[in-house]
Amino acid sequence: METKIVKTHTGKIYVDIKNRLEFLTVGDYGKENNIKANFLGLTKEINGVANTEVDLSKKWVATISTQKGCPMKCKFCDVPKYGFYGNVSIKELSYQIETIIKNEEVKQTERFNVHFARMGEPTWNKNVLDFSLILKDLVKKCGLKAETVHPVISTMLPKANKNLKEYILKWCEIKNEFYNGEAGLQFSINSTDDEQRNELFDGKSLSLHEISELAKELPMPKGRKYTLNFPVTAQTILDAKKLSMLFDKSKFIVKITPIHETNSAIENGFEVSGYSDYDVYRKFEMPLLNEGWDVIVFVPSKEEDSDRITCGNALISYEKKRDNSNGND
């Protein structure tokens, strides 16, 4: 497979045009620099994140694609501009991890996180479940000694997926038993208003009531709790009391991030700001804390968005360059 590499401030984006794959490796600035989480003892408000050197030997994040493009049509994401060309195979999932590891000199890390969150909705692809069972051995086979291998599934909860509950329950079993709690599950909630959610997810996600009913069937998490993810803008509706009625605080935490500055987010009128001002996060965080929620606020650096590390951008850019070089518009 022929893969191009795009260097970013925090890592690399890999682009395989022929096989329609895009995947990402990044280091981390350190949780004390880009995370506020009172329940973890990280109580300092983050007013801007400085772009500094990252240390892969501490924490290394690989974000890989589970589909070639995506069938979801989320209004804040650029991947729909690329199209959808099917699921990624186990061989292609392995290839992404192998490529990420072999292109770095680091051979030992405290933590290797694998996010199934690049292009695609992972719950449409059963290969992700099977792959997670060989992931730890694959990492070792690639020559990386990782004290912890921590895979994470992030889902938009597609309502057309009739096997969604079965899939998520299987993932919970893998998280709790095979990984002994060292794995993650994130639900993309984004709003506590169904009308706003329908706009964001183009009507393709379950309703809040349906997600709440599904959440009740999840086993108690071992290790880390499950995550309710809220990429926020100034327009986001996040009613802390309603969230408390819908979800169990003993099972879930809340994660607040900004919506990334994608072309689609800008075109659809989302206010994508807040990288250097904690006020935009505080107004969502405080009511949740008052309701007794464990809350993580993740603040990226402005450079991370300027790198266009969000899903699909590098692949779309290379496709345009190729088309232009072939004389196409």
Q: Language-model features: where?
A:
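Disulfide-bonded cysteines in secreted/extracellular proteins and peptides
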Residues: 70, 74-77, 311
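Core AdoMet radical
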Residues: 56-63, 69, 78-218, 225-234, ...
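N-terminal [4Fe-4S]-dependent radical SAM core
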Residues: 1-66, 88, 93-108, 327
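Active-site micro-motifs of SAM-dependent methyltransferase domains
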Residues: 31, 72, 121
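Auxiliary Fe-S-binding modules of radical SAM enzymes
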Residues: 1-40, 207, 213-329
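Short acidic/His/Gly/Ser-rich catalytic and metal-binding motifs that mark active-site loops
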Residues: 72-74, 194, 263-265
